[in-house]
Amino acid sequence: MTQTTAIFMATALVVLATLIPTYIISKRSAVSEDDWAVADRSLPIYVVIGTQFASAMGGGILVGHLGNAYLNGVAILIYGFLTALPFFFVMIPAKWLRQNNFTTVPEILRHFSNNSKFVGILAAVMTIFVPFGWITSQITAFGSIYSTITGVNYNLLCIVFTFVSLLFVMPAGLKTVAWTDFIFACFMIVMCIVSVIYVTNMGGGLQNILSTVDPDMISMSGSIKKLGAGTVLLWVFSVMPGGVTNQLYFQRVCAIKSTVYKGLHRVGI
């Protein structure tokens, strides 16, 4: 068995091990419109935490910004902070959103505009536009990684992964997406811990790494200088507005089973 075959077989097993349980969960009852939009408002808080985490920490961070941190240092933590901060803002109206049974950002804005169709259409277009880069980054990140380690054509991998992604949506919309996100979030956390331990050992221990790395890489001011203050400023004016208006975040808040939000701050943490 070649390395490429082994990688694809392992990937297929992980996908199936995630899809099958979530498919069974989604098929316990008939699929409704609410299942597709807000998972029938039945998601436990721990699933919401997992799916929000997986939505925020997708391919852009796991691949792009991980490489960015390798090149420019600890300043990349600012991006992670800006990604998490919107959750605390979303938490403020969370109970009101859930009690009013909203499902989408356009629906919320139409509520404040006397049910204006123009506002609804404009909001719908922007709701698609804002997370478009995040969504495509998942596909391109997969293509970049697997093309490098397998030698398979990058464009072909992106197309295949697009269709695989549809398999997570087709059974019951957000209900299956949320549960698969939760499973993947657990997997991401475990692999993060394993990777930190493994890489630290490869580097000869934390003290050895700190003594050999460029001091600017582990200094916030030096790292910002390497990265560019303009880049950090652009993050502030793109990630923050994008986060507090992100349909993905609001949709999952509206899908929480309970209207009690004492634990919702855990999403941001």
Regions found by a protein language model. Give the residues of each.
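Juxtamembrane interface elements at the cytosolic ends of transmembrane helices
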Residues: 17-33, 93-106, 167, 173, ...
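Helix-loop-helix module between adjacent transmembrane segments
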Residues: 18, 78-170, 235-239
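Small-residue-rich segments of transmembrane alpha-helices in multi-pass membrane proteins
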Residues: 43-51, 112-122, 184-198, 269
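Residue-level recognition of pore/gate-forming positions within transmembrane alpha-helices
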Residues: 15, 55-56, 83-87, 127, ...
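Selective recognition of specific alpha-helical transmembrane segments in multi-pass small-molecule
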Residues: 17, 125-135, 187-199, 232-244, ...
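Membrane-interface "cap" regions at the ends of multi-pass membrane proteins
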Residues: 1-62, 169-172, 185, 191
